[in-house]
Amino acid sequence: SKGLVGSEMCIRDSTAIHNPTEGVTYQLGNLTTINSKYKIMTVCDFRTQDIAMGGQGAPLVPVGDSILFSKFTACLNLGGFANISRKKNKKVIAYDICSVNIVLNYLSMKKRIKYDKNGLIASSGKIITSLLNELNSLEFYKLNHPKSLGVEWVSDVIFPILENFLIKYPLESVMHTYVIHIVNVISLSLSPSDKILVTGGGAHNKYLIKKLKLKTEARIILPSNEIINFKEAIIFALLGLLKVLNINNCF
């Protein structure tokens, strides 16, 4: 904010290209330019380094989750993509589950609306069984973790499927079915004993959260709006601090 002065800056890069299976990711934001402009220590481009070391480059939050939110058995982020991090056998595992807001917002824009507030559009539709079956059977869901998703996968795989069904079915029903698909896939990563912290823009989607609570026996916990909206920013600030302190910031 205006007048705020810091000694270090951490940039959460925007991903332009992400294909970890080919060892490729590209983040918007140039370290040298940013550092020259603001004249302070700058940390950025986390994903490139992670992939260079054999990782997926996403998700990058499990370190922060394990430090700041350790009282939860797992942390579920509902952003452009759903990703989860949890402790398993004294290790932290994290992976992308499915595409969420990147798809729901794409469908909302067809009605000239930026996003489906509270899931009102989706809640007015009906299930399309054939679409749900096709989505649920996608190859990505059969892969073992670690695994991650990028916009390229959504453009090449998800959007063509949805466009095909939009020819024959109302948008409301396509969106409704996609929400059910999201819930189905996420529930496979949860167990009845889980205490799940849910954050990200999708946590504000009341219809999505309602369906998720009905689908799983796990305890779904929504924190304050500040944590829902800014948890990822807080964690990236922590990752930057760990880098400055020369402490491992990647599992």
Model-identified regions with their sequence ranges:
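Single conserved hydrophobic/aromatic residue that forms the stacking wall/gate
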Residues: 1-11
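Hydrophobic alpha-helical hairpins/lids featuring a short glycine-rich hinge
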Residues: 12-21
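Active-site metal-binding loops of divalent metal-dependent hydrolases
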Residues: 15, 80, 201-204
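Phosphate-binding/catalytic loop of phosphoryl-transfer enzymes
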Residues: 20-27, 35-36, 40-115
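Glycine-rich phosphate-binding loops at beta-strand->alpha-helix junctions
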Residues: 24, 195-212
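Conserved ATP-utilizing enzyme core subdomain
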Residues: 93-183, 245-249
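A short, acidic, amphipathic alpha-helical segment used as a generic capping/interface helix at domain edges
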Residues: 183-190
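Glycine-rich phosphate-binding/hydrolytic loop that grips phosphoryl groups
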Residues: 223-251
